[in-house]
Amino acid sequence: MADWVLHVDLDQFIAAVEVLRDPSLRGRPVVVGGNGDPTERAVVATASYEAREFGVRSGLPLRTAFKKLPDAVYLPVDHALYEAASADVMAVLRSFPVIVEVMGWDEAFVGVTVDDPAEFARSLQAAVLSATGLHCSVGIGDNKLRAKIATEFGKPAGVFELTQANWVEVMGHRPTSALWGIGTKTERKLVELGLSTVTDLATASADELAARFGPRMGPYFRGVAQGAGDTVVSATPWVAKSRSHEKTFQQDLASLDDIRREVVALAHQVALDVVAEGRPAVRVGVKVRFVPFFTKVRLMKLPAPTSSADELAAAALVVLERFEHGRAVRLLGVRAEFSDEDVEPKPSPSTYQ
């Protein structure tokens, strides 16, 4: 018997749930985002595989998606529906003698001790499909990093194993962006250092990486390229680190008074979540997306922890003054962050944080 980490990832989760609700959507390009109106300002939450064939992906502006694929079915986001479907899937996983660490609506790590992890993974897939009608891919690894990356090779609805034994063979020749946690910006910086592949990064000078990315992130990137990762799967309930609200405006805001008014309204919404959380906020952040699509975030530490809507709003206005004004605004957001100390566990997340 051996200890394994499995990464369970529901395939095109949101789109798949919408197809379960309306089977007539099966096989059609489905795009979910915002209020379902592709002429409004919002982004794609998810797209079915049929829509992805036309270049429609999560995070793409809905208007851009509509230009690429005007004949797709556009649907509004239904948080309650996806939350319920996710809970059903996690309940299936917990029915096995395993440890389940929920990572979001559509994914979880599973810790298990078995002789044949691939066979066990297929039994998980069958159980999830039978109980919920949803397909999932499963990555198998000797740590979380490898299991997470393995899932990408198993999509859709497949199983793939990635361990120390086959890490170099599978990953060595791939670009560094294939690694979990390395995005396109970091990839470009690595290329500037002559590090194009995973093997390049894994064998790079630790001192050189530390000089370019800092003493913490430099060695971290090198470790990721070597496949190093956490092996512990924890069932400890997820705890929110912050609460936030954002609003995208269909008409740009040009007046500073209008911007202030919206920030106060968002802060009051956030305060309701802070009170419900039962923990005071210690920091307040404001996010501003200027026209055409330039985003900045500012953050400040509060003089004292608070759950007061008025105090959070006042702090948000102070943060707002740290931005350079003069450009029209298309999106505003307010975030309240909690202290990491004396945290009381809460139920697992129902939305991405």
PLM regions with names:
Residues E107-V112:
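A generic structural motif
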Residues V100-G104, V138, G278-R279:
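Short beta-strand
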Residues V114-S177:
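Long, highly charged, low-complexity intrinsically disordered interaction regions
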Residues M1-W105:
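Residues that scaffold, gate, or flank divalent-cation-dependent active/transport sites
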Residues V17-V19, A42-A45, R146-G154, V233-T236, ...:
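Short acidic, glycine/serine/threonine-rich loops at helix termini
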Residues H7, A178, T186, V191-L331, ...:
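DNA-contacting surface of Y-family translesion DNA polymerases
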